[in-house]
């Protein structure tokens, strides 16, 4: 009588071995996160110089260079000179200086302001790897090149709010007002919410602690938040708002998605500029759309 072949017995790992495998997998994930974290934080668009120049021409922007002739961003002087003030823009991840022409259009549509847009290292055709350190160094260089005799305002969006907050805290006496669009209180808190099982506070190198930098700034800070923002949930912006002790104003868009402010009408920018320029120190004024 033929006997049916016996099935191989399944290998059953002991509990200590299973635990060891879980620990090894967790450590591997942590190592990968530490090694590739900047690839997750920064997703720069990269273009040739020829394409950048072509897009800049279409957007009515011109190259902004430092004293050595190196590319540091884009600019658009006010069509009506002399300009009343200067606005420096720090954009969000995945965007670029050319991609901020809509801010120049909106702001110059209601005010005679010169617009300067910082380009981050590694973005468009600017050389260098992006990191918190390189972005801050680029911001320092660019800010110090702005005209000193006019009021300077900062507009930051998403990741760029970390750069704008750094500038506000570093050059507090030179900055007349700030607008932060879809901001976070710190990238550490935002990352921790995305990866709650990982020791983010130990792994993260680029922390962008906006709330810390703004402690050194006492000027006017406007904050625009979108209620349906899934990239930077508005709770992180509210943390930044409530933690700021200076004069502030909130624009809340309950149905808005990430950085949807770009579609706001001229009245929004008129309100922002009026808030910046008013002599009365308004504290914690809220406006909903």
What does each of the following model-derived ranges do?
Residues 19-64:
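An N-terminal hydrophobic leader/cap segment in hydrolases
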Residues 256-267:
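Catalytic histidine-centered segment of alpha/beta-hydrolase-like enzymes
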Residues 103, 210, 219, 233-242:
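Short alpha-helix in the alpha/beta-hydrolase fold that links the catalytic acid
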């Amino acid at each position: 009588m033929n006997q049916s072949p016996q099935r191989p017995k399944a290998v059953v790992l002991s509990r200590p071995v299973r635990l060891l495998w879980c620990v090894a997998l967790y450590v591997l994930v942590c190592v990968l996160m530490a090694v590739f974290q900047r690839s997750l934080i920064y997703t720069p668009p990269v273009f040739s110089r020829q394409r950048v120049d072509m897009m800049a021409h279409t957007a009515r922007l011109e190259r902004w260079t430092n004293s050595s002739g190196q590319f540091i961003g884009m600019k658009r002087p006010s069509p009506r000179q002399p300009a009343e003030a200067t606005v420096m823009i720090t954009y969000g991840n995945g965007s670029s200086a050319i991609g901020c022409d809509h801010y120049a259009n909106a702001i110059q549509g209601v005010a005679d302001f010169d617009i300067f847009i910082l380009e981050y290292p590694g973005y468009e055709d600017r050389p260098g790897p992006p990191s918190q350190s390189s972005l801050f160094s680029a911001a320092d260089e660019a800010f110090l090149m702005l005209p000193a005799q006019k009021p300077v305002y900062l507009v930051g969006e998403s990741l760029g709010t970390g750069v704008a907050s750094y500038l506000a805290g570093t050059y507090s006496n030179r900055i007349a007002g700030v607008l932060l669009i879809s901001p976070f209180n710190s990238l550490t808190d935002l990352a921790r919410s995305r990866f709650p099982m990982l020791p983010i506070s130990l792994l993260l190198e680029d922390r962008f602690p906006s709330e810390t930098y703004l402690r050194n700034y006492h000027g006017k800070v406007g904050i625009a938040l979108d209620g349906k923002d899934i990239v930077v949930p508005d709770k992180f912006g509210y943390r930044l708002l409530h933690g700021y002790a200076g004069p502030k104003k909130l624009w809340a868009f309950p149905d808005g998605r990430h950085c949807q402010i770009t579609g706001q009408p001229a009245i929004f920018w008129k309100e922002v500029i009026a808030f910046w320029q008013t002599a009365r120190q308004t504290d914690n004024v809220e406006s909903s759309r």
